[in-house]
Regions:
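Histidine/lysine/aspartate-rich catalytic loop segments that bind and position anionic ligands
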Residues: 81-86, 90-116
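Hydrophobic anchor at the start of a short beta-strand
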Residues: 57, 96, 133
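C-terminal active-site subregion of NodB/CE4 polysaccharide deacetylases
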Residues: 1-34, 40-41, 104, 108-220
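Active-site-proximal beta-strand/loop segments in catalytic clefts of secreted hydrolases
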Residues: 60-63, 100-101, 139
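Active-site beta->alpha N-cap acidic-glycine motif
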Residues: 3-92
Length: 220
C-alpha cells in the first residue's frame, strides 16, 4: 500500500467508473484495491493499513455471512466482520459492495435465484450500512460462475458493473459485467506487485482463458 500511495497509483471505485465511461486523465497502470468475502481481517488488518496510506478500496461482502464464525468454506477458520465493523469500514473510506447473499456460484442458478441473490444482498447492505451499492463480485468468479444472462440480471437489479476472478487488466471497452482482476497473495514479494502494476503479469490472462476452454470442452 505504501508503494501505491508513494506513486499515486490508487483508484477509487468512482475513478474506475469514470475510466470505463471514457474519462481522460487516469494513468494506465492505476490500481483499484478489492478485497473479497468480508472477513474480520478486512476490518482489523486491512482497514488500518489502507487508512494510514490513504488508499481507497472496495470490500465485497456477503450479507448472509456477516458476523458468522464460519462461512461457505469450512477449511477457512477466520470469522466474518459484523455490521458494526462494516460500518466502521465504510466510515474509514472503504467502499462496501455485494458478493451475493450466500456465496454460492451463480453459474448454475435459475434466473429467479440469481435475481434474489443479487437484489437481497444489495438491499440489505444499503439498508444496514446506509450506502449505495453499485458493484458486484461473483462468488468464486471463474467462467463457470456467471453467464451473459447473469450480467443482464445484475443490470436490471441496479448494479453498474461486476467483477470476476479471471486474470487480466481492465481496459476501456471491456464488458462491464465481466471485469477481470489480478490476484495478489499476501506472501508475494513487492517486486511481483510492481511487475503487476506495469503489465508484467498481463499475459497470464491467455493461460487463464485457455484453461477454461479446456475444462469446458466436451468429454472433460
Amino acid at each position: 500500500m505504501a508503494f501505491l500511495s508513494r506513486h499515486g497509483l490508487a483508484l477509487s471505485l468512482s475513478d474506475l467508473e469514470q475510466f470505463l465511461a471514457g474519462a481522460p486523465g487516469i494513468r494506465h497502470n492505476s490500481v483499484l484495491v478489492t478485497i473479497d468475502d468480508g472477513h474480520l481481517s478486512t476490518w482489523s488488518i486491512a482497514r488500518p493499513i489502507l487508512k494510514r496510506h490513504h488508499i481507497p478500496a472496495v470490500a465485497f461482502v456477503t450479507p448472509g455471512m456477516v458476523g458468522r464464525k464460519r462461512g461457505f468454506d469450512e477449511r477457512i477458520s477466520e470469522s466474518y466482520a459484523g455490521w458494526s465493523e462494516l460500518r466502521e469500514l465504510t466510515a474509514s473510506g472503504v467502499q462496501v459492495a455485494s458478493h451475493s447473499m450466500s456465496h454460492r456460484s451463480l453459474g448454475a442458478m435459475s434466473s429467479s435465484q440469481v435475481r434474489e441473490e443479487a437484489a437481497m444482498s444489495k438491499t440489505m447492505l444499503e439498508d444496514r450500512l446506509g450506502v449505495e451499492v453499485g458493484a458486484f463480485a461473483y462468488p468464486y468468479g471463474t467462467r463457470a460462475d456467471f453467464t451473459t444472462a447473469t450480467g443482464q440480471i445484475l443490470r436490471d437489479v441496479g448494479y453498474r458493473f461486476a467483477f470476476t476472478s479471471q486474470h487480466g487488466p481492465i481496459s476501456r471497452g471491456v464488458n462491464h459485467w465481466e471485469l477481470p482482476r489480478i490476484k495478489i497473495e499476501g506472501g508475494e514479494p513487492l517486486w511481483m506487485f510492481r511487475l503487476a502494476t506495469r503489465g508484467g503479469l498481463d499475459q497470464w490472462k491467455w493461460i487463464d482463458r485457455s484453461l477454461w476452454r479446456l475444462q469446458a470442452s466436451p468429454g472433460r
